[in-house]
Amino acid sequence: NIKIILREKGLKDEEYKNQIKWIIPNAQKNCMEPIHLLLEKGGETCPDNPHEGEEFGYVLSGTVQVVLGNRSFKAKKGESFYYDAKYKHYLKSKNGAKVLWISSPPSF
């Protein structure tokens, strides 16, 4: 099944200072969901409660803190992260960042 996507669709969250762009619109029906995440200075994602699945991210620019439960890990430009989503989790960035983020199964 081949899909050609011509543009991303997005959503901006003023409260959390982030913007999510769906790289594959309506990917919720697929096995995985890739998004382009822009964290503004001091931005973060809404904390996500534990759920089944796995998440992967690749930092395109800047630095992010990956918060998993009561632990925190740093990932900078060119680095990636991968985790089981069984812990409460979110990303944050002090100075802003861009991330390619993939969730399986879809959760955005």
Feature map (PLM): residue ranges:
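Short acidic-glycine-tyrosine-enriched beta hairpin
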Residues: G69-A85
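A generic structural motif
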Residues: E54, S61-T63, N70, K86-K88, ...
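Short histidine-centered beta-strand/loop micro-motifs
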Residues: T45-H51, L91-S93
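Short C-terminal boundary/hinge segments that cap the last helix of small helical domains
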Residues: N1-K3
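Ligand-binding loop in jelly-roll beta-barrel domains
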Residues: Y16-N18, K76, A85-F108
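A short glycine-rich, His/Asp/Glu-containing loop-to-beta-strand
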Residues: E8-G43, P47, I102-S103, S107
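Short, conserved beta-strand element in jelly-roll/cupin
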Residues: L38-L39, P50-V66
